[in-house]
Amino acid sequence: MTARMDKRFAELKAEGRPALVTYFMGGDPDYDTSLGIMKALPEAGSDIIELGMPFSDPMADGPAIQLAGQRALKGGQTLKKTLQLAADFRKTNDATPIVMMGYYNPIYIYGVEKFLDDALLAGIDGLIVVDLPPEMDDELCIPAIRKGINFIRLATPTTDEKRLPKVLKNTSGFVYYVSMNGITGSALPDPSLVSGAVERIKQHTKLPVCVGFGVKTAEHAKVIGGSADGVVVGTAIVNQVATSLTHDGKATADTVQAVATLVRGLSTGTRSARLVAAE
């Protein structure tokens, strides 16, 4: 783990609560608004930030995140600007871990070595690249780890006992358990199935296990956080941005505050998760 990531999970373990991991799309709907959102996330209770890298062909994302990426690209967002977003955030916040999430194509075009160097300079702690399987670890995963950047893998309900060790082999930071098959923004999974899956993964790794896909409300966060080391929320936040925009997709005076209000509620749910689990 990077020092920031390691420290954050150690703090959360001492507090006896799961992490709230919040995803937003870099550059949605514009650079300045997304920077405002990024700064507001930890103030509202987010423990770890997932910074989305917009891409024109996001095959694993549902309609909400696809639209967010389109808005960002339309507004001129690039991978370089997404790295700059993190660097600007770091000017006022050096404590909150940042994980960049997206697809390999923009990184490949940017140049892997240059991307990793620039990511380090920007204060990036980890990467989630959804279309790079373990068989392609030499492409980005191994170089990232050598630079001191975590490479976070996804496990799913179909990741069986034979496949799981391969998925976890070079994983660092935390494991992201995708709680259901399909695209982002799906319905809430069965909590008992999630609990069993987290236990199964923990038999193979000492890393924290964070659960995402389908978490939209404080109550969802409370339930899922009862068994997971972290709760990941993405689509609900992206939807909150979208509903605050003008009819032509421009930010309003309410955009940042709307996201902050949602995240405060999610934080309350996450922080009460272990109390519920202990009852």
UniProtKB/Swiss-Prot annotation:
<dbReference type="Pfam" id="PF00290">
    <property type="entry name" value="Trp_syntA"/>
</dbReference>
<keyword id="KW-0028">Amino-acid biosynthesis</keyword>
<comment type="similarity">
    <text>Belongs to the TrpA family.</text>
</comment>
<keyword id="KW-0057">Aromatic amino acid biosynthesis</keyword>
<dbReference type="GO" id="GO:0005829">
    <property type="term" value="C:cytosol"/>
</dbReference>
<feature type="active site" description="Proton acceptor">
    <location>
        <position position="50"/>
    </location>
</feature>
<dbReference type="InterPro" id="IPR002028">
    <property type="entry name" value="Trp_synthase_suA"/>
</dbReference>
<comment type="pathway">
    <text>Amino-acid biosynthesis; L-tryptophan biosynthesis; L-tryptophan from chorismate: step 5/5.</text>
</comment>
<keyword id="KW-0456">Lyase</keyword>
<keyword id="KW-0822">Tryptophan biosynthesis</keyword>
<dbReference type="InterPro" id="IPR011060">
    <property type="entry name" value="RibuloseP-bd_barrel"/>
</dbReference>
<dbReference type="InterPro" id="IPR013785">
    <property type="entry name" value="Aldolase_TIM"/>
</dbReference>
<feature type="active site" description="Proton acceptor">
    <location>
        <position position="61"/>
    </location>
</feature>
<dbReference type="GO" id="GO:0004834">
    <property type="term" value="F:tryptophan synthase activity"/>
</dbReference>
<protein>
    <recommendedName>
        <fullName>Tryptophan synthase alpha chain</fullName>
        <ecNumber>4.2.1.20</ecNumber>
    </recommendedName>
</protein>
<comment type="function">
    <text>The alpha subunit is responsible for the aldol cleavage of indoleglycerol phosphate to indole and glyceraldehyde 3-phosphate.</text>
</comment>
<comment type="subunit">
    <text>Tetramer of two alpha and two beta chains.</text>
</comment>
<dbReference type="InterPro" id="IPR018204">
    <property type="entry name" value="Trp_synthase_alpha_AS"/>
</dbReference>
